[in-house]
Amino acid sequence: MQIKHNLLDIEGTTAPIAFVHQILFPYATKNIHRFLKEYQLTELQWKEVQTEFQKDTSSGDPLFIEKFRIKNVPSGLIVNEVPNTLSKDMVSVYFEYLIEKDRKFGPLKEIQGKIWKEGYESGEIKSTVFDDVPKFLNDAIQSGIQNHVYSSGSVEAQHLIYQYSVLGDLRQYFTMYFDTAVGGKREKTSYERIASTLAVSPSEIRFFTDIVEEAEAANATGMDVVILNRPGNLAQKPHPFPVWEHF
């Protein structure tokens, strides 16, 4: 069946991994304590944070324990029990830990997006996008193909990356944006939901990613997939999918 929709990952696909890990993540870490002093977490966010925190207290991860010892959080809190309500200071330390672990955690991604928005709007951040991206997106549109985004970063963060890119505002090239609200990127059902939202057969969608497990999940629905091997991308396990060095 003819491809009518491109579904594109961001990190390692349209933007360098280094930009995300060396610019965006450190900026969020540097500003998260200040931001959480002013930002009111929603009731749902608090609940999700506490649930995730409880999972980590029983994981025994040395980095987790060390993170809280450095911040003088009582060790008994880590080993024995978690209070019903976490202080904002503790949440900011926990989010620093999650950033370091590159955890795909909804509330963190939402708050990161808001912090990055401040950075983009102040001019402190300018996103790096691969040079071949605008032409590829424009050529697709000229051929009658719509472009969409699917990233673990929040939809707000996705808009910001393309709005404030070094190549100009690229949002004109995209129709829809999807984040983990539709599900994890390694889950088949996530791609089924995206196809359903677009009201097309999965076989009419081509998914571009740098991660084989994501490609496998998408391909299991009938989507066509392409693996991007950009500079700085991680080596992938053997797979049957086509590999592109560039668009």
Curated annotation (Swiss-Prot):
Record-linked SUPFAM superfamilies: HAD-like
Annotated TM spans: none
CDD domains the record matches: HAD_EP (cd01629)
Catalysed reaction equations from the record: 5-methylsulfanyl-2,3-dioxopentyl phosphate + H2O = 1,2-dihydroxy-5-(methylsulfanyl)pent-1-en-3-one + phosphate
Alphabetically ordered keywords of this record: Amino-acid biosynthesis, Hydrolase, Magnesium, Metal-binding, Methionine biosynthesis
Cofactor-binding details, from the entry: Binds 1 Mg(2+) ion per subunit.
Protein name: Enolase-phosphatase E1
InterPro entries: Enolase-ppase_E1, HAD-like_sf, HAD_sf
GO MF: 2,3-diketo-5-methylthiopentyl-1-phosphate enolase activity; 2-hydroxy-3-keto-5-methylthiopentenyl-1-phosphate phosphatase activity; acireductone synthase activity; magnesium ion binding
Function per UniProt: Bifunctional enzyme that catalyzes the enolization of 2,3-diketo-5-methylthiopentyl-1-phosphate (DK-MTP-1-P) into the intermediate 2-hydroxy-3-keto-5-methylthiopentenyl-1-phosphate (HK-MTPenyl-1-P), which is then dephosphorylated to form the acireductone 1,2-dihydroxy-3-keto-5-methylthiopentene (DHK-MTPene).
Species whose genome carries this gene: Leptospira biflexa serovar Patoc (strain Patoc 1 / ATCC 23582 / Paris)
Subunit structure: Monomer.
Cofactor: Mg(2+)
Family of the protein in this entry: Belongs to the HAD-like hydrolase superfamily. MasA/MtnC family.
UniProt entry tagged with the keyword Hydrolase: yes
Enzyme nomenclature, EC number: 3.1.3.77
Pathway(s) this gene product operates in, as recorded in its UniProt entry: Amino-acid biosynthesis; L-methionine biosynthesis via salvage pathway; L-methionine from S-methyl-5-thio-alpha-D-ribose 1-phosphate: step 3/6; Amino-acid biosynthesis; L-methionine biosynthesis via salvage pathway; L-methionine from S-methyl-5-thio-alpha-D-ribose 1-phosphate: step 4/6
HAMAP family assigned: Salvage_MtnC (MF_01681)
Tree of life domain: Bacteria
GO biological-process terms attached to the record: L-methionine salvage from methylthioadenosine
